[in-house]
Amino acid sequence: MDCPHQDVLHLIKYFRKEWPVVSDSERTTICGADNMLLTLQLALAEVNKQNGKEFSVSLSDVLLTWKYLVKHKLGLACEDTVVPKDYADIQKTYDLFLKNSNSLDLIDIYEKISTAGSSEAHFLSSEQLLDFLTNDVCLSEGTDFPIVSTPCKNNLDTVKVKPTLKRIFLAYLNLLVNAKNDFALAQVLNCPERGLGREAFTDLKHTSRLKNMSIFLVATSFIRTIELGGKGYAPSESDPLRKHLKGLSLFVHFIDRLNEIFGETHDPRTAGELLLSTIKMHLIKGRGSGDPLSEAATEVAQDLDLRIKYLINLVSEDKSSGTTGISPVRPKIRAINRGTASGGRETIKTLLKLLDEEAANPPSKNKADLLCADEENTLFGAFSLFTLFRSPEQTGSSPKALSQRVQKAINKDKPKLKHNLIRSQFACTYKDSNLTQTKQWDFPSMSQVPS
């Protein structure tokens, strides 16, 4: 396989072309190799929590389960292969995460195209896709990769700032295209700082499960109800989301600003530039022009803007070269954004192509750097996915925090001191039963004196 990245991208392009046959929604986003691994990490931790353990998982368990999951989904697992513990529950939780986020992973794309009987699937075999996902590909000569290091405590250096900023920009664009994507929302909910940390995300997550809605829809409906519903429809005072009202309002209103660009800007080039510029200004607000983070955000926005314009130019060239004098096909009934302007629809299609290119990227070389994010270092207020999904609230079956368990063990080993009960400020007027009993034995009555 000369260029696995291009073969995977070709597979994704065919999926977009034939989406009415193989998918239920044109806005379905594709989960790349790195996001597949992050989703599996969350699924493993969730299963551990359901089994009464902590919401955590070791790096070795994630990597071992990852290799088996890829082989099993591709039908390449050998009969004598050791099946990871609780694998059925892990795969079920993994698939549920993707389904709730209206996403498909690369293996799902391959299976759907193969099931449809398309010859496009033969350009990429299951063994080649396995090698691509597990990093066992033959790289062409002259390919250089950056040297990665073991995660450290202070890892907010210039090398890692731009990739993190790029993920934030793409997460915002992903959320605009697919409002059901909870993983995209988790990356931008508190980015920039809005006071929406782990507690706010946990409250949103619990409410979304109770109402069977996406987290973004929960936040939007809560703000709309307060702003437009009136007193009769206002949420109760005990609603856990009320304490996050200010931050949720800022977040929802900013997404509204981005959505307005789709309706007001018909040219996809201008719309893409405005979207990236709005996100950039929102992130660097309050920072000076010479701030390193501001400069990095500007560079990332410019790079993505050039990529969007390049994709638009490719579409224009294809249309001009493929003109045959035949009238264009009428839009499909289930087309993107059919109730809005065609300009907004073209912008969303362009953003989907950009996100698809990112999904076709090879997996990261350093899995530890990807999975073991530092909880103390946050960029623009953004937390890692694993940090957010690990609920700070403990359920009845979940163990208490480690600090609480240690303190309880220390208190248990301490000798307990017995104090006499003081009944009132005039305790000296009361007779102590123990003292009375002692005096009774020390000074027996005459009847107890032996004759």
Identify the role of each PLM range:
Residues D2-S451:
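Conserved helicase C-terminal RecA-like lobe
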